[in-house]
Swiss-Prot record:
It is an enzyme of class 3 (hydrolase). The keyword DNA-binding does not apply. Keywords: Hydrolase, Metal-binding, Zinc. Catalyzes the deamination of 5-methylthioadenosine and S-adenosyl-L-homocysteine into 5-methylthioinosine and S-inosyl-L-homocysteine, respectively. Is also able to deaminate adenosine. InterPro entries: Amidohydro-rel, Deaminase_MtaD/DadD, Metal-dep_hydrolase_composite, Metal_Hydrolase, MTA/SAH_deaminase. Zn(2+) binds at H72, H74, H221, D309. This is 5-methylthioadenosine/S-adenosylhomocysteine deaminase. One of its GO terms (molecular function) is metal ion binding. It comes from Saccharophagus degradans (strain 2-40 / ATCC 43961 / DSM 17024). PANTHER family: AMIDOHYDROLASE-RELATED DOMAIN-CONTAINING PROTEIN, AMINOHYDROLASE SSNA-RELATED. Its cofactor is Zn(2+). It comes from the Bacteria. Substrate binds at E101, H194, E224, D309.
Length: 446
């Protein structure tokens, strides 16, 4: 007879950064996991006497922290990485990306591109991602098979694409997808109206009603450029954020991507409706779209999180790099060295993102009772020495390549920097094959 507590997995490490409670850092402790849940965080010295465990992984040089959550991207667009650079948003979209999508995007493209993106995200510490792209059923299936947590937002536009004929068709297909994944814990289906300038009033009203009925998230590009805002004022008499508020689309389940153009009226709306802002600093910088005033948002207690956007406009999917850029940019925009500190940047990529997704009760921090989504980072490197401030190192020393292990729901998806549920060679081979086809078509001028 034993009084030991049963456990499936124990992972011990030099440090554990739980994110919540704020300011806590465990040293020489271990995460104890059973049935995909964190059941304890205890000193490593006591695990043998307290637990009857199936597996123990000791990582003496590593930091454990919550898995990162990429709040906005277009995963399959990784196959368009570097296709068109050094261009403003609308020229980039209209002259390069939309024509390429019309030529190449189908279900196989989305499957292959999503697998490429997931491989990159997992290897750099992302355990959960929000996606908005065509053929969302392919992305959802790929995420489920890989064991990643995901919010898949089905696209809605006024005009036809290869995935649908118009708003009614997009919504019909999206609702079917939502039904298919209703009981799948790892995959959440949301509404993805592309932008205020590509979706008209009636579809936006319907989305608002349906999302409320289904308790589903809404993710939309919003205030990405100054032109978007000025066009809305010219065409509708109000700024885009006010327009979607008037249509019933703004609320605590709404995730607003970019928000580089913000005035006092916008701040008031965001506060009143408890909407979330997704900051994509590297994409905004690359497309010269503007600067999201993150420090101002946070001063008004507006939940702000991080996304990479797609690799076609970034051009990588490293959230650690995004944290670094966000922190530096936040200081520059606010003209305050104490703006967007390392703690804040880490929260934006973890608990804030989980809050925006409505998942902060299960992920986003390492706490007893939450799901075991966490990563390990090796700090036994020259570029991390000496270690005075771990959180500063996480944000400021480019650690994405130092991720050694990744767990989602207690399952190991990366071990010793090797993918466990995705085939690296196959993914790379398919990406190269797409490159050959796309380059040949572009060279022919067809």
């Amino acid at each position: 007879m034993t009084n030991k507590t049963p456990a499936d997995l124990i992972v011990s490490a030099r440090w554990i950064l739980p994110v919540r409670p704020t300011g806590r850092l465990y040293e020489h402790c271990a995460l104890v996991i059973r049935d995909g849940n964190i059941i304890e965080i205890v000193p490593t010295s006591g695990i043998d006497s307290q637990f009857d465990y199936q597996e123990h992984i000791d990582l003496p040089n590593q930091l454990l922290m919550p898995g990162l959550i990429n709040m906005h991207g277009h995963a399959a667009m990784s196959l368009f990485r570097g296709l068109a650079d050094d261009l403003p948003l609308m020229e980039w979209l209209q002259d390069h990306i939309w024509p390429a999508e019309g030529e190449w995007v189908d279900e196989q493209f989305v499957l292959d591109g999503t697998q490429l993106a997931m491989a990159e995200m997992l290897l750099s510490g992302t355990t959960c991602f929000s996606d908005m792209y065509f053929y969302p059923e392919a992305a959802a299936g790929a995420a489920f098979e890989a064991g990643m947590r995901a919010q898949i937002n089905f696209p809605i536009l006024d005009f036809p694409t290869q995935w649908g004929s118009g708003p009614e068709d997009y919504i019909h297909k999206g609702l079917k997808l939502h039904d298919n994944y209703r009981s799948v814990d790892l995959i959440n289906i949301g509404f993805g109206p592309h932008a205020p300038y590509t979706v008209s009033d009636e579809p936006l009203k319907r989305i608002a009603v349906l999302a409320e009925e289904l308790q589903a998230p809404i993710q939309i590009h919003m205030h990405e450029t100054a032109q978007e805002v000025s066009d809305s004022i010219a065409n509708f008499g109000v700024r885009p954020l006010q327009r979607i508020a008037d249509l019933g689309l703004l609320g605590p389940a709404t995730q607003l991507v970019h928000m580089t153009q913000i005035d006092e009226q916008d701040i008031a709306l965001l506060t009143t409706y408890s909407a979330h802002v997704v900051h994509c600093p590297e994409s905004n910088l690359k497309l010269a779209s503007g600067f999201c005033p993150v420090h101002t948002l946070q001063e008004h207690c507006i939940n702000t999180c991080l996304g990479t956007d797609g690799a076609a406009s970034n051009n990588d999917l490293s959230l650690f790099d995004e944290m670094h850029t966000a922190s530096l940019l936040g200081k520059g925009v606010a003209q305050r060295a104490d703006a967007l500190k390392s703690d804040t940047a880490i929260e934006m990529a973890t608990i804030n993102a989980a809050t925006a997704m409505g998942l902060d009760n299960i992920v986003g921090s390492l706490e007893k009772g939450k799901r075991a989504d966490f990563i390990a980072i090796d700090f036994s490197n020259l570029q991390q020495a000496p270690i005075y401030n771990l959180k500063s190192h996480l944000v400021n020393t480019h650690v994405s390549h130092l991720v050694t292990h990744v767990w989602v729901d207690g399952k190991c998806l990366v071990a010793e920097r090797e993918l466990q549920t995705l085939d690296t060679k196959d993914i790379y081979s398919k990406a190269c094959a797409w490159q050959v086809k796309i380059q040949a078509q572009r060279a022919s001028g067809k």
